[in-house]
Swiss-Prot record:
One of its GO terms (molecular function) is structural constituent of ribosome. GO terms for cellular component: small ribosomal subunit. Belongs to the universal ribosomal protein uS7 family. The gene is rpsG. This is Small ribosomal subunit protein uS7. One of the primary rRNA binding proteins, it binds directly to 16S rRNA where it nucleates assembly of the head domain of the 30S subunit. Is located at the subunit interface close to the decoding center, probably blocks exit of the E-site tRNA. Part of the 30S ribosomal subunit. Contacts proteins S9 and S11.
Length: 156
C-alpha cells in the first residue's frame, strides 16, 4: 500500500455547447494528440446528425446509449494455488462509465463509414437501440461473468 494520500478527483469542466460533464469526458477520451477542437467538432457533428435522424434530444440519446453499454459485472484474474481463475466482480459506477466510453469509441473507430462523425453517430444510434459492437462487448463481459459464476467466492 502507498503511504501517500490519495489524490483528490479533478473536476472536469462541462462541455461548452451542452454543459454536460459526461460529454466532456467523452470528448477527452476521443481526443488524439491533444487536439481537443477536432474532438469537439467530431462529437458535435455526430450529435447534430443524430438529432436530424432521430428527431430527439441528442444529449439524452447519448446518455441512453452509454447506459445501454455500461457493464454491471466483469471478470478479473485471480491466482489461487498455481491456477488463474476468472472471478466475476461488480463494476463501480465510475469504472462502468469509463468502460462504456472506451467501448463506444473503439466500436465507432471500427465502423466502415468514411468520417469519424458518421461512425460515431451510427454507433450512438445503434447503442441507443441496444445493438452494435459496443453493446456486444458489454454482453460478452456479462456472459464471461455468468460462465465463471462458480468462482465468485474468490472475490476480494
Amino acid at each position: 500500500m502507498s503511504r501517500r494520500r490519495r489524490p483528490e478527483k479533478r473536476e472536469i469542466l462541462p462541455d461548452p455547447k451542452f454543459g454536460d460533464q459526461v460529454l466532456s469526458k467523452f470528448m477527452n477520451n476521443l481526443m488524439l494528440d491533444g487536439k481537443k477542437a477536432v474532438a469537439e467538432g467530431i462529437v458535435y457533428t455526430a450529435l447534430d446528425t443524430v438529432e436530424a435522424k432521430a428527431k430527439t434530444d441528442p444529449v439524452q440519446l447519448f446518455h441512453d446509449a452509454l447506459n445501454n453499454i455500461k457493464p454491471q459485472v466483469e471478470v478479473r484474474s485471480r491466482r489461487v494455488g498455481g491456477a488463474t481463475y476468472q472471478v466475476p466482480v461488480e463494476v463501480r459506477p465510475e469504472r462502468a462509465q469509463a468502460l462504456a466510453i472506451r467501448w463506444m469509441i473503439s466500436a465507432a473507430r471500427g465502423r466502415p463509414e468514411t468520417t469519424m462523425a458518421a461512425r460515431l453517430s451510427g454507433e450512438l444510434m445503434d447503442a441507443a437501440n441496444n445493438r452494435g459492437n459496443a453493446v456486444k462487448k458489454r454482453e460478452d463481459a456479462h456472459r464471461m461473468a455468468e460462465a465463471n459464476r462458480a468462482f465468485s467466492h474468490y472475490r476480494w
